[in-house]
Each structure stands twice: as structure tokens, then as C-alpha cells.
């Protein structure tokens, strides 16, 4: 094998990932020398001036993250990274399973809880999980800086196991609500902390794809829930097996948790520099010692700044800074807006009530039909895994939301004609035209395809929006917004179908999608391929849509040049 060519020295003392951009030189002073390019010229255009500001901030404030240094093998996923992402994503599997299991359970539970469940009781049972997830999500980000990310994952698994056992053994509606609430705590903890954990361990160039793996696990969990639900449709007390089996993956993850590393940033917060360096070296096995040290040095600068900030501020002051500091506020608006859009589009009505809807439409095994919907969700989440980094977050959202809008409009139209004979209301055991029922199903599949490719996973990239000292609080608030909107949707869907008709309900969801598209078009910058410090810089003066696109374009060009050196 030929010798590896020497890597150009583009990393000292601190550089951005753009080898052509200026690097400050230190000569015993903390103040950088004049910023200039390697050929001696000064920045000329807007992009170059913007990037010179990035470098100057890195030099003066130490605000860069480790993504500001590109190393050899940056765009490769090693076995170690695959192992830790796969193990962490088991929480995503549980998240998906426990939110989808309710769909198959509701159609076969009958009077096993002492009464035939009314629409209101079904909504309360479903919403109990969402309320638990709301509280769990709020708690996760707030405590994870103190406990570490791994311990929060342990707490989530304990909740998954306890809630599953409680549901499987319950004999009253109140006990079922309690079990769903406990499971919801686990869902909230997992939904907040796992994307954050993966994002902090992932190399910058593939961060989006690795976080999306957790979304793939969520959709896979939904498929498993529908498959198990379909298998137990005709089994006495089969619903107890459906909810009880949800505990099994938790035992697997608890066994694997000892092999998962803590986030290097958490280790640096604990002054464990050696531990952080060892984990970083495993993540970047092709990197030189100098490159690993440089990443640790830059990470430590950001962590030290956060420690100093935290030492001189209370938790409430950091919470206040999310609203009062412009860069933090804009990041919070983006994160909360995307999470609200993810739920208000109505997708989880399919996850919670698809079996109920398809049973009313006349499909014999409604849970099996729901399995088709969940499978499409998995397939197009895999598409998202492929495109989320190279195509970009913003472009993906702007392309897929119109697909969702179109599909929801189709569904509203088909529901209108489908229910003409029943005064616009879906009625059980009514013989609806099979052709229109199939058209409703097809429109929902198109809707799910659009959702899974964009809105289903991109909001969970929220960790990249916030600086370290407010990242835990920021992601908690965004996750809480997600589950608050989820609770609104889950707790009103059946009632909305009765009050506004199915056609009206899906028309309302289409309207929310239109608002979401306008939000993304006006406010959402492109964060794909940018280091965490660069994302922060983008928000310094407005929402930085054009600035982010310019930075990303230039970084892609420079990354291609660097890659060509080693080919």
C-alpha cells in the first residue's frame, strides 16, 4: 500500500475547516495578528469577511467546537461509532414502539379494563403518554449536564420497563393511564437526550446522518409495534402482550450501557481531559495525535467558557439568556418552531389512531394496514438518512412540506366524498366504498413519505442550534414544545373528527403544514455541514439564511479539495 501523503498544516494554531481562510497567528499574545489568507491577501468578498469573523471569534473567545478542525477520516463512520450510535438508538426503538403500540391495543382491548372505552377515555389514555413525555423531556436536558448523558438513558430504560409492566398487569382505566404516563416519562427522556448524545459524539460532516439513525430506530419501533399488534389481534388478552413486550429492548440497552462512552464534553466538564481524548481518538481513528489534541483543545476552550459562564450565572439566568440574548433566542425560535410543526401537522394521529381509522373504513385487519403506513415511514426515513447532510436541512424541508400539504388536501377531499352518506362522520360497521377507502390510504402513504423524509427527523437536529452552556435547557424546551403539541393533537383528534368531520380535521392539518413551510422559508437557515460554532455565528445578525448557505457552499468546496489530497 502506498504511503499516505503528508497532510497540509492547516490546523495551527486554531483554524476553521476552510483551509483557504485566514488563521490568526499567536506570538505570545492572546490577540490575533491581522487576518489574512495564506497568500498574504486580505478578505475581499462577503463570504471571506464573514469567515474571517468566525476565525477571529475562535481565536479571541475560544467559541469553536471540535468540528472547526477537519481531520482525515472525518466523513467515515467507524465500527466504534456504529456501535455507540446503534446502542443509543435502542431508546429510539422504544420511543417508536411505545407510541405506536397504543394503536393496535385500542382496537382489541374491548371491556378488559372493566368498561368499553369511550372516545374520551381513549384520548386520555393516549395523552397520558404524551404528558409523561412532556415532563420527561423537560427534565432530561436540565439534569443531563449534571448527571451525564448516559445516566439519563438509564433512567429512561427504568421508566420503559416499569411502565410496560404496569400496563400489562393493569385491570382498570386508571392503572392503564398510570402505566402509559410512566412509559411517557421514558419516551420524553429518550427523545430529548439520545439525539443530543449522538450529536455530541458524531463527526461534523456526518452528524445529521447519525442523528437521523435514531429517527430510523423510532420508525422501526413503530413497525415492530404494528407487526406485533397484528399478530395478537385474535389472541385473548393479546393487548397485554403488545404492551408487555415493550420492556424487552430496555434490558438489552441496560446491558449495553456500560460499553457506551460518556460525551467528551461532559468529561471535559468533569475535568477528565484524558478520558475525553481517548474517546475522541476512537471516534477519529485515522486522525493524528496532533489533530486529536487540537479537537480536544478547541472543545476544552468552549467547555471552559461554559464553565465560567455557568459559575457566574444561575440556572434561571441561563434560561433568561435563551430569550434575552439574540443568538440564543433565534436558535430557540427555530428549534421550537420546527418541533411544533412536526406535531401540528397531525402525523401522530396516524401512529395513535390509524388502526381505529382503518377499522372504520372497512379494512378487515386494520392493524396490518397500519403496518403498511409504518413501513413506508421507515423506508422514507432511510431516504432522509441518505440526503439530510448532502442535500441539506433547509432544502429538504422546503421540498417535502408541499408534498405533505398536497397529500392532506387529497385526504380531505376523499374523506368528504367518502362520508357523504353518513353526514360527514365516520361510523363503525358502515359499508363505505372500497375505492374511496383505498384512495384515503394512498393519500396517507404519500403524506407519510413526505413527513418521514423531512419533518419527521430534521427537528431532532435541534442540539446543533444551541451553544453548550444553554444546550441542555434549549433542547429541553424544544422537546417540551414537541410533546405539548403532541398532547394537543392526541387529546383532540377523535373529538375533532366528530366536530369538524374527518375532511375538516385533515384540512386543518394541511393549514398547519402551510404555516410550517412559510416558517422554514423565512427563518430556517442551512445548518448542514457547519460546525456548532459556525451555526452560532450564523444567528448573530438575524436568522442568517443567506449567510449559512454561503458558508456551507464554501465549506463543501474546501472539503472536496482536502479530500482530493488523499485520493
From Swiss-Prot:
The portions of this protein that span the membrane are 89-109, 124-144, 151-171, 181-201, 210-230, 241-261, 344-364, 368-388, 398-418, 436-456, 477-497, 504-524
By its UniProt entry, which InterPro entries does this protein fall under? MFS_dom, MFS_sugar_transport-like, MFS_trans_sf, Myo-inositol_Transporter, Sugar/inositol_transpt, Sugar_transporter_CS
Phenotype of the disruptant?
A: Increases RNA level of ITR3, ITR3B, and ITR3C. Reduces mating hyphae production; conjugation appears normal. Simultaneous disruption of INO1 leads to an exacerbated mating and sporulation defect, and attenuates virulence in a murine inhalation model of systemic infection.
Q: What domain of life does the native source organism fall in?
A: Eukaryota
Topological domain (Cytoplasmic) residues are 1-88, 145-150, 202-209, 262-343, 389-397, 457-476, 525-567
Q: Which segments carry the region annotation Disordered?
A: 14-42
Subcellular location field: Cell membrane
Q: Which Pfam families match?
A: Sugar_tr (PF00083)
This protein's UniProt keywords: Cell membrane, Glycoprotein, Membrane, Transmembrane, Transmembrane helix, Transport
* GO molecular function terms listed in the Swiss-Prot or TrEMBL record: transmembrane transporter activity
Topology check: give the Extracellular ranges. 110-123, 172-180, 231-240, 365-367, 419-435, 498-503
Q: Specify the inducers.
A: Induced during sexual reproduction. Expressed during infection of host.
| Polar residues bias: start-end ranges | 16-33
The protein's topology relative to the membrane is: Multi-pass membrane protein
> What is the recorded function of this protein according to its Swiss-Prot or TrEMBL entry?
May function as a transporter or as a sensor for myo-inositol.
Q: Which family does it belong to?
A: Belongs to the major facilitator superfamily. Sugar transporter (TC 2.A.1.1) family.
> Matching NCBIfam families, A to Z?
SP
Tell me which PANTHER family the record gives.
PROTON MYO-INOSITOL COTRANSPORTER (PTHR48020:SF12)
Q: What is this protein called?
A: Myo-inositol transporter 1
Amino acid at each position: 500500500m502506498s504511503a499516505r501523503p503528508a497532510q497540509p498544516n492547516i490546523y495551527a494554531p486554531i483554524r476553521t475547516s476552510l483551509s483557504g481562510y485566514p488563521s490568526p497567528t499567536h506570538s505570545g499574545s492572546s490577540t490575533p495578528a491581522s487576518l489574512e489568507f495564506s497568500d498574504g491577501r486580505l478578505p475581499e468578498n462577503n463570504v471571506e469577511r464573514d469567515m474571517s469573523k468566525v476565525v477571529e471569534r475562535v481565536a479571541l473567545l475560544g467559541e469553536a467546537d471540535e468540528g472547526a478542525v477537519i481531520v482525515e477520516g472525518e466523513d467515515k463512520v467507524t465500527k466504534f461509532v456504529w456501535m455507540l450510535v446503534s446502542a443509543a438508538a435502542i431508546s429510539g426503538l422504544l420511543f417508536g414502539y411505545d407510541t405506536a403500540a397504543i394503536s393496535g391495543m385500542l382496537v382489541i382491548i374491548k371491556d378488559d379494563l372493566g368498561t368499553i372505552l369511550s372516545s374520551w377515555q381513549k384520548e386520555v389514555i393516549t395523552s397520558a403518554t404524551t404528558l409523561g413525555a412532556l415532563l420527561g423531556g423537560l427534565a432530561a436536558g436540565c439534569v443531563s449536564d449534571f448527571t451525564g448523558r448516559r445516566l439519563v438513558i438509564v433512567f429512561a430504560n427504568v421508566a420503559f420497563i416499569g411502565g410496560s409492566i404496569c400496563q400489562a398487569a393493569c385491570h382498570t382505566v386508571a392503572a392503564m393511564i398510570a402505566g402509559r404516563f410512566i412509559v411517557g416519562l421514558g419516551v420524553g427522556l429518550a427523545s430529548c437526550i439520545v439525539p443530543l448524545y449522538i450529536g455530541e459524539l458524531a463527526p461534523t460532516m456526518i452528524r445529521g446522518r447519525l442523528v437521523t439513525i435514531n429517527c430510523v430506530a423510532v420508525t422501526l419501533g413503530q413497525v415492530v409495534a404494528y407487526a406485533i399488534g397484528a399478530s395478537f389481534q385474535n389472541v385473548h388478552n393479546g393487548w397485554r402482550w403488545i404492551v408487555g413486550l415493550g420492556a424487552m429492548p430496555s434490558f438489552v440497552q441496560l446491558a449495553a450501557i456500560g460499553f457506551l462512552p460518556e460525551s467528551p464534553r461532559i468529561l471535559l466538564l468533569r475535568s477528565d481531559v484524558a478520558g475525553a481524548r481517548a474517546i475522541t481518538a476512537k471516534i477519529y481513528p485515522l486522525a493524528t495525535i496532533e489533530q486529536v489534541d487540537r479537537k480536544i483543545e478547541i472543545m476544552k476552550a468552549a467547555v471552559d467558557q461554559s464553565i465560567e459562564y455557568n459559575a457566574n450565572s444561575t440556572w434561571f439566568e441561563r434560561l433568561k439568556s435563551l430569550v434575552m440574548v439574540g443568538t440564543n433566542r433565534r436558535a430557540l425560535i427555530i428549534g421550537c418552531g420546527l418541533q411544533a410543526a412536526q406535531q401540528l401537522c397531525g402525523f401522530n394521529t396516524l401512529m395513535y389512531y390509524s388502526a381505529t381509522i382503518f377499522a372504520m373504513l372497512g379494512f378487515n385487519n386494520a392493524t396490518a394496514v397500519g403496518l403498511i403506513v409504518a413501513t413506508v415511514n421507515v423506508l422514507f426515513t432511510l431516504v432522509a438518512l441518505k440526503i439530510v447532510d448532502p442535500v441539506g436541512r433547509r432544502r429538504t424541508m422546503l421540498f417535502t412540506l408541499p408534498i405533505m400539504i398536497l397529500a392532506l388536501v387529497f385526504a380531505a377531499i376523499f374523506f368528504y366524498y367518502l362520508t357523504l352518506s353518513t353526514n360527514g362522520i365516520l361510523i363503525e360497521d358502515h359499508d363505505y366504498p372500497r375505492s374511496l377507502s383505498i384512495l384515503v390510504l394512498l393519500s396517507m402513504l404519500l403524506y407519510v413519505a413526505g413527513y418521514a423524509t423531512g419533518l419527521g427527523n430534521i427537528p431532532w437536529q435541534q442540539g446543533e442550534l444551541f451553544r453548550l452552556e444553554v444546550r441542555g435547557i434549549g433542547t429541553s424546551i424544544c422537546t417540551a414544545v414537541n410533546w405539548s403539541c403532541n398532547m394537543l393533537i392526541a387529546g383532540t383528534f377523535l373529538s375533532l373528527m366528530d366536530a369538524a368531520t374527518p375532511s375538516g380535521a385533515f384540512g386543518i392539518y394541511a393549514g398547519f403544514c402551510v404555516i410550517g413551510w412559510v416558517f422554514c422559508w423565512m427563518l430556517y437557515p442551512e445548518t448542514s455541514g457547519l460546525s456548532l460554532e459556525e451555526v452560532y455565528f450564523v444567528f448573530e445578525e438575524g436568522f442568517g439564511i443567506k449567510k449559512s448557505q454561503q458558508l456551507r457552499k464554501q465549506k463543501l468546496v474546501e472539503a472536496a479539495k482536502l479530500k482530493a489530497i488523499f485520493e
